[in-house]
């Protein structure tokens, strides 16, 4: 299969090496088409800041296949994640600490209350049955830093997600506050929050979305309002 590579301000040497193994696609519509045309039965995402244990893919694949043989509504799996605090210095990464991120999530299907804690299940800890993703993913903006959580809420309204209580994914947090080495969503937290809200509002306005999805989104809005009112009341006292 002929590999197609489009270069956009990325190191030429890196791209040359990468092109021998993978296709790099930047256009969003091309990504959607590539997902549809792929012969793979599964789909996963890797944030460029994060990392996996060597057995991540094989372990999640085997557990998901086993679970699906019993529970047909389970079309995705997420493992426990460790938070890695680190500093980037030139070409070196210095790890300061590693600690549990979401180890409170029990084995089994995810409860709906997980949606109240944004990124409690990180993008890089999930593996999906590809066919279950196709109809959902096209409603979301892949190029947005806030892509995953609105997509995950939408996905959870239509599918069950199984939790594997094994820490096989690593959620990296750069302590640098500069744009070269820091985490985009941390440095641009306000923009990230705005894009999440816009995506959630768009889903709430869509007449095509399920009633369950609208209930989930309404609960998020009500929960946010409750915390804001409580904060104001505490300030008044």
Report each predicted region and the residues it spans.
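Nucleotide-sugar donor-binding/catalytic module of glycosyltransferases
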Residues: 1-189
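N-terminal cationic leader/targeting segments used for protein routing and processing
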Residues: 7, 92, 131, 203, ...
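General helical secondary-structure elements
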Residues: 55, 88, 198-201, 224, ...
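Catalytic core of nucleotide-sugar-dependent glycosyltransferases
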Residues: 171-174, 181-212
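Heptad-repeat coiled-coil amphipathic alpha-helices that mediate oligomerization/assembly
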Residues: 210, 214-237
